[in-house]
From Swiss-Prot:
GO terms for molecular function: DNA-binding transcription factor activity; RNA polymerase II cis-regulatory region sequence-specific DNA binding; zinc ion binding. Gene3D superfamilies: Erythroid Transcription Factor GATA-1, subunit A (3.30.50.10), Retinoid X Receptor (1.10.565.10). GO terms for cellular component: nucleus. The keyword Transcription regulation applies. The lineage of its organism: Eukaryota, Metazoa, Ecdysozoa, Nematoda, Chromadorea. Expressed in the pharynx, intestine and hypodermis. Transmembrane segments: none annotated. PANTHER family: NUCLEAR HORMONE RECEPTOR FAMILY MEMBER NHR-28, NUCLEAR HORMONE RECEPTOR FAMILY MEMBER NHR-86-RELATED. GO terms for biological process: regulation of DNA-templated transcription; regulation of transcription by RNA polymerase II. This is Nuclear hormone receptor family member nhr-28.
Length: 437
């Protein structure tokens, strides 16, 4: 039996495996590697409307490179020193053999303009920084001293573990936002806090829905640490760790168990039904972040939010038309936007649950997490949020070089390192705490 290769996600030709984070043929992989290594800048003469398919001769390099980024190819995965050696070898060959004059540039396509000006720069930047955040997460949430290079079976966690995960996420997600949106850093401190406290909780729930899409499951809530909350067995979440004299574990399950069904009905099922992908997830996150009409929001912040919303909507429409080539992009975008009101219902339910637990002392909630959920942040949040790692963890991180990141402890850019991301594991049938769909 002959098994056909997966098609190239850029041009549709027979694929040659995963290259730089996406399925690609050898030609597209070589094109992307050389473009990044030589820092090429292309401009499309057709305003970014070119078709990128295997049967098109002389494909537009600007649109081809834009599509490479859109399908998930990462510039940080290109090892530039290999191209440097290749260039040296080429120069040596050309000097020794004057009959050979390889072309290292394409004058018709070179321009001071960058491909991002006609493509989807913000969504691509969000995607790249999100991948880096996922790398950092593997270290930050490695509290058990496990080898981060070995695949770890996820487990159902209790509320204390989930809250600890989310506390660490506050700084990580803030760093992701600051790196992805230069405009955000220009805002006044109070406006940053206003937008972020309105964003973090919806993002936390949205990401659960996105992870459910990736794993095609809605019976569990995936956490950034890789563990999960079993929606069908809320007793594993509350269990016997409820120490309040006001409520028993069984009463806690009866009181808060229905919330899981609300999350599933309003967020998980709709997102899985629409099969929301990474760029659509980033679009939803951006629309939630750049909200308007918030109490205390300045006119400058409102205008900045509007500009960023319009930019994101233009980019996702470009993504639908030029990358995914959807026949009716407007309808697809409308179905995506319909998810936002349902998301807000889940957010309100979560806030109500946390408020009840805090007022009646049902179970302990960290003050920082409670303040964020209830819409309050300390004045020095963006200066004092700390992400601590041990000396051993810092050594482990330094494996393969990638882009620098913002260190919230030092308040400056520092070098970060990346290592191969293992496939996400989900609970198996052998796990007695697992509930299959």
């Amino acid at each position: 039996m002959i098994i056909g290769k997966s098609p190239c996600s850029v041009c549709g030709e027979a694929g040659d495996g995963a290259h730089f984070g996406a399925e690609a043929c050898r030609a597209c992989a070589a094109f992307f590697r050389r473009s990044v290594a030589l820092n090429k800048a292309y401009v499309c003469r057709a305003m970014g409307t070119c078709v990128i398919q295997k049967n098109v001769r002389c494909m537009c390099r600007a649109c081809r490179f834009t599509k490479c980024i859109a399908v998930g190819m990462r510039k940080s995965a290109v090892q530039r020193h290999r191209e440097l050696f290749a260039s040296q070898e080429t120069s040596s060959e050309s000097s020794s053999n004057p009959r050979i004059s390889p072309t290292l540039s394409w004058p018709m396509d070179i321009s001071p303009q960058s491909y991002e000006e006609t493509g989807m720069p913000t969504l691509s930047q969000l995607n790249e920084n999100y991948n880096q955040m996922s790398t950092v997460r593997r270290v930050i949430h490695n509290t058990g001293g496990d080898n981060i290079f070995h695949r770890r079976e996820p487990k159902a966690v209790a509320y204390t573990d989930a809250h600890n995960v989310h506390l660490k996420e506050i700084g990580l997600v803030a760093d992701w936002i600051i790196k992805s949106y230069p405009d955000f850093e220009q805002l006044h401190q109070e406006q940053k806090k206003l937008l972020y406290r309105n964003f973090f909780l919806p993002f936390m729930i949205l990401e659960c829905g996105y992870m459910c899409c990736l794993n095609n499951r809605t019976d569990i809530l995936f956490l950034p640490s890789g563990d999960y909350i079993d929606c069908n067995r809320p007793e594993t979440f509350y269990g016997h760790r409820i120490k309040s004299h006001l409520i028993s574990p069984n009463e806690a399950v009866r009181m808060f168990g229905p919330s899981f069904e609300i999350y599933r009905r309003n967020v998980l099922d709709p997102m899985r039904r629409e099969n929301v992908d990474n760029f659509e997830f980033f679009t939803l996150c951006s629309l939630v972040l750049w909200d308007h009409g918030l109490e205390g929001q300045t006119e400058e912040c409102v205008q900045m939010a509007r500009c960023n919303r319009e930019r994101i909507l233009r980019e996702v429409l470009y993504y639908y038309r030029r990358v995914k080539q959807i026949s009716d992009p407007s309808m697809r975008l409308a179905n995506l936007l319909v998810l936002l009101p349902a998301l807000q219902r889940s957010v309100r339910r979560f806030q109500e649950d946390v408020e009840i637990t805090h007022v009646f002392n049902v179970y302990s909630v960290e003050e920082t997490f409670y303040e964020l959920v209830s819409g309050r942040l300390s004045d020095s949040f963006f200066q004092t949020t700390q992400l601590t790692t041990s000396v051993e963890e810092e050594k482990v991180i330094k494996t393969e070089e990638i882009d620098s990141v913002w260190d919230l402890n030092k308040g400056q850019l520092v070098e970060m390192y990346e290592f191969p991301t293992p496939p996400l594991h989900t609970p198996t049938e052998m796990d007695p705490s697992t509930t299959q769909l």
